[in-house]
Amino acid sequence: AEKYPHGLPKPYSDDPTQWLFHGHPCGSVVFNEKTGLLEQGPLRIDETVLQVAVARLLGYRWPAELDEKMELSDESRHWVKKSAELLPFADADGIVCLPSVRGEAPAAERLLDLLVASYGEAWQMDILSRLLEQVDHSGKTLETWLREKFFRQHCRLFHQRPFIWHIWDGLRDGFAALVNYHQLDRKNLETLIYTYLGDWISRQKQDLDRKIDGAAEKLAAAEGLQRRLELILEGEEPYDIFIRWKPLEKQPIGWEPDLNDGVRLNIRPFLTVPTVGLKDAGVLQVRPGIHWRQDRGKDVPSAPWYHLFKGKRINDHHLTLKEKQAARKAAADK
């Protein structure tokens, strides 16, 4: 009662891993112990600012922004409204390439524009160097942080369930894109493969014709990435998705993920295609701490894979396209 003379404050959080988070890269809400009230805190300069800004750039929004009925403090609602002012910076298809592709500015430039807008009149250039210091990248650039450290730090912050994926061709100066998993349906994967990566490949071919140094290496790496992404699009085993609680006729055919099945199961083909860089990372810049080992507990006899797995909750299973297509046809013919 002494700490909360006005009663418990309404919910608030500056932690982007919480549903209650207001969504603003640098906004803060603090509890004033002298007055016993919530108030607007100072603009944040911590290790989460760049992570939130990248997520916003990729079009991600937090539950508190989308649910007007969520119980939230007025101070948090203030930042939800300020977050809405940043929506024009969000990429429409949830694909942001690190180099400039198709006339879009490179990711680092777009991210900087969003940061400047987030801090508003408080922005000074030393804020960027302080933010980079917070993410263990002192004296370096936003572009190299995106290429080298963003994804590893993103996986760590969000408990190894990344929702922004860093897809690359294995070259430090090659093709790389950040992709919003929540928007990565079949159509968007095709857009990544044939529109963005396709444009990059065309440019490398032109550079090769002009005998520009490094073009052959970049072209080979980009075409290698394109082939791997096509394997995921097609989804023949072992580049398939397997969902333990779905019967054979409801298993995804090719890249047609049900986002409700979660990152852990849907990310598998991106990690199982032949690796372009780090061991077992597939086409991702680093491998998240994700496994498909057997889950705890036993399945009920009515579970679709109970008999095959003898009640064990097996996730590391693969199915051919032929098996799945036949099962769908049989179910449709019933």
Predicted regions and their residues:
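Beta-strand-rich extracellular modules
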Residues: Y4-H6
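Terminal accessory regions of large proteins
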Residues: P9-K334
